[in-house]
Amino acid sequence: MKIVEVRHPLVQHKIGLMRNAALSTKDFRELANELGTLLAYEATADLDTEPHTLAGWAGPVTVQRIAGAKITVVPILRAGLGMLSGVLSLIPAARVSVVGLQRDEETLQPVPYFERLTGRLEERDALILDPMLATGGTLIATIDMLKRAGARRIKGIFLVAAPEGIEAVKAVHPDVEIYTAAIDAQLNDKGYILPGLGDAGDRIFGTRVG
């Protein structure tokens, strides 16, 4: 499995700012989108291109264009939406596929409740967006969903990832690539990443549970 912890100074600076518990909703949301852009830049560095000849100001010129079908971006509801605008600012022609999962309180396993995927997935790179890769259960379920629909090349983009989640995904889907701003120390007994960011969904949307 390809695992990339992006060590670019701007990425490290921004993820550091997000760890501040006193950070405003506005600033947290803006940083999530900015990091979405930077991480997507890294995740798309190996896209295939093909030559294309067009009419330049001084005559014909050959340029490079992205080959194949448009990328699909796959935000996981709801927190993944907090990174979507940043990724689309980099890839404005991307198709958007949306998935939603919730935990079954008896089995503790993620259960899909919403799925709206673009067509021709077998021809597209799929970029999954979720601020946190914690236990890996949600990501595994999302990858399962995409592969059933025909997706072959899948990458996950996360603000923060836990080693336990990475290993869980690696055991089931070693062909998937992971891009993250930080691989943190561990999960606590409630499945939260330490030191982490807290509940990224609540911090992006300005809500609190309970």
Curated annotation (Swiss-Prot):
Protein family according to the UniProt entry: Belongs to the UPRTase family.
Cofactor: how and how many bound: Binds 1 Mg(2+) ion per subunit. The magnesium is bound as Mg-PRPP.
Gene3D superfamilies listed in its UniProt record: 3.40.50.2020
GO molecular function: GTP binding; magnesium ion binding; uracil phosphoribosyltransferase activity
Record entry for activity regulation: Allosterically activated by GTP.
Enzyme class: transferase
Keywords in alphabetical order: Allosteric enzyme, Glycosyltransferase, GTP-binding, Magnesium, Nucleotide-binding, Transferase
Function field: Catalyzes the conversion of uracil and 5-phospho-alpha-D-ribose 1-diphosphate (PRPP) to UMP and diphosphate.
Protein name: Uracil phosphoribosyltransferase
Cofactor needs: Mg(2+)
Higher taxonomy: Bacteria, Pseudomonadati, Pseudomonadota, Gammaproteobacteria, Lysobacterales
Biological processes annotated in GO: UMP salvage; uracil salvage
